[in-house]
Amino acid sequence: MAKKLTATVELMLPAGQATPAPPVGPALGQHGINIMEFVKQFNAASKDMEPGTIVPVVISIYADRSFTFIMKTPPTSFLLKKAAKVQKGSSDPKRQKAGKITLNQLKEIAQLKAKDMNTQDLDAVMRTIAGTARSMGIEIEGYKG
């Protein structure tokens, strides 16, 4: 018989740098999960990623207090800021541009994000990411969406 799922917790954690401090401790502690065990498993699973990369993680908690987790790709905004080498997006994206990325960088981000999207069409993923870039004030050189 399959384990009974009791809760699902979604967190955004830095790769390889999770600690039992908030937000991990309180989020998992209230469900009776061994927090250190999760921290060790998460840090081991994310050790190959660049340190500090924000990683969304979905933790499934079962009735017997065991858990499984799925790591997703970093948020699109994080990848765009990293590619454009900016700290944050523009507060007024129509008038003020925060930075620029190339068409190749857009394609790389789209290929990385494709597995988390609800489509496998790379052009559709690129359009979605271009829309996010536009709303952040990041210009894409050579892209006519």
UniProtKB/Swiss-Prot annotation:
Gene3D superfamilies: Ribosomal protein L11, C-terminal domain, Ribosomal protein L11/L12, N-terminal domain
GO biological-process terms attached to the record: translation
Post-translational modification: One or more lysine residues are methylated.
Keyword set, alphabetical order: Methylation, Ribonucleoprotein, Ribosomal protein, RNA-binding, rRNA-binding
Gene Ontology molecular function: large ribosomal subunit rRNA binding; structural constituent of ribosome
Pfam families xrefs: Ribosomal_L11 (PF00298), Ribosomal_L11_N (PF03946)
Annotated InterPro entries: Ribosomal_uL11, Ribosomal_uL11_bac-typ, Ribosomal_uL11_C, Ribosomal_uL11_C_sf, Ribosomal_uL11_CS, Ribosomal_uL11_N, Ribosomal_uL11_N_sf
Cellular component terms per the entry's GO annotation: cytosolic large ribosomal subunit
NCBIfam families the record matches: L11_bact
Function statement: Forms part of the ribosomal stalk which helps the ribosome interact with GTP-bound translation factors.
Oligomeric form and interacting partners: Part of the ribosomal stalk of the 50S ribosomal subunit. Interacts with L10 and the large rRNA to form the base of the stalk. L10 forms an elongated spine to which L12 dimers bind in a sequential fashion forming a multimeric L10(L12)X complex.
Entry similarity comment: Belongs to the universal ribosomal protein uL11 family.
Official protein name in the record: Large ribosomal subunit protein uL11
Name of the gene this protein is made from: rplK
